């Protein structure tokens, strides 16, 4: 796994993902290599050196695509291993044991993904449904805990609309995971400050990683929650990203692009009173501590 701690890190992104079959929408097939390489080049000029790629098994992950993007642009892509959430699980999540699922993750961390030299650097994005953890999701979380305990690689989760984060942490902790090795995803999709503070108090990291998705939750409210965390001295527990998943998100297709975080959101954050040092904590220092 290549990781440059001197640069910025986008903590939760997708470079190649295909949920078009599940959603019956070709826009959900993100696979346009030339457009994505151009955007990675743009990110490099803005100081980004690492992209944490959250596409796991059966989400349309493409290891060779990631390797090619790295070679062409010079950006580091940290790949993941795991299973997403119940609605997207393949049949064998039902039939295989927890130990077998864990071993699959371990193999992708230690040996490589799909016969390539690319090894998973993180167990992710393991998810739960909105307002509940299904039995199969619990099974995957336990498998992820086993794989983490064997390899030491960190865990990054998916919460549906900022629900079940505390329950995710309780489940992982019950199976021996040190919560300082867990980051909870999608904490920025509702008024969620109380739960965020509880998760941080337990030792976990939190992600504001749907920045720019104003139709779900406006960026000005994200900024207000970040101010509340800054006032409490907790920015060292926060990481940022955008969760690009669609063709229409790309700039070449009229979208805001991967650099919206840097070109639009960060200037808004600075204008609201954040210092450059505050920004650097969330985009460089904290990810460098967590992901290496």
Per-range role (PLM):
Residues 1, 260-292:
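Mid-to-C-terminal alpha-helical segments outside catalytic/metal-binding sites
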Residues 6-11, 16, 25-76, 99-118:
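Alpha-helical scaffold segments that flank or form the walls of functional sites
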Residues 8-10, 49-50, 76-78, 120-122, ...:
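Structural preference for beta-strand elements that scaffold enzyme active sites
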Residues 12, 51, 83, 148, ...:
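Divalent metal-coordination and catalytic microenvironments
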Residues 19-23, 63, 89, 165-170, ...:
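Histidine/acidic-residue-rich catalytic or RNA/ligand-binding cores of hydrolases
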Residues 54, 209-210, 234-255:
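Short acidic/histidine-rich active-site segments
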Residues 68-71, 76-151, 205, 210-215:
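Active-site gating/metal-coordination segments in enzymes
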Residues 149-228, 238:
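Catalytic pocket-lining loop regions of alpha/beta-barrel enzymes
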């Amino acid at each position: 796994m290549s990781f440059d701690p001197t640069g910025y890190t986008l903590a939760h992104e997708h470079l190649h993902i295909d949920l078009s079959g599940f959603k019956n929408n070709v826009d959900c097939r993100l696979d346009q290599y030339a457009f994505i390489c151009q955007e990675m080049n743009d990110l490099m000029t803005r100081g980004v050196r690492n992209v944490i790629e959250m596409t796991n098994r059966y989400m349309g992950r493409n290891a060779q695509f990631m390797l090619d993007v790295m070679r062409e642009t010079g950006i580091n892509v940290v790949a993941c291993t795991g299973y997403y959430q119940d609605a997207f699980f393949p049949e064998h999540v039902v039939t295989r044991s927890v130990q077998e699922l864990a071993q699959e993750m371990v193999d992708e961390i230690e040996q490589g993904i799909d016969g390539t030299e690319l090894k998973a650097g993180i167990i992710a994005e393991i998810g739960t449904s909105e307002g509940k953890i299904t039995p199969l999701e619990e099974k995957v979380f336990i498998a992820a805990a086993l794989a983490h305990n064997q390899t030491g690689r960190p865990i990054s989760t998916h919460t549906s609309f900022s629900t079940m984060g505390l329950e995710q942490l309780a489940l992982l902790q019950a199976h021996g995971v040190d919560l300082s090795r867990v980051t909870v995803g999608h904490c920025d999709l509702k008024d969620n400050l109380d739960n965020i503070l509880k998760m941080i108090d337990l030792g976990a990291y939190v992600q504001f990683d749907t920045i720019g998705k104003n139709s779900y939750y406006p960026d000005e409210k994200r900024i207000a929650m970040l101010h509340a965390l800054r006032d409490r001295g907790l920015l060292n527990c926060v990481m940022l990203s955008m969760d690009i998943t669609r063709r229409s998100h790309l700039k070449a297709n009229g979208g805001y692009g991967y650099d919206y975080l840097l070109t639009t959101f960060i200037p808004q954050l600075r204008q609201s009173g954040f210092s450059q040092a505050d920004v650097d904590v969330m985009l460089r220092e904290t990810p460098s501590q967590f992901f290496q």
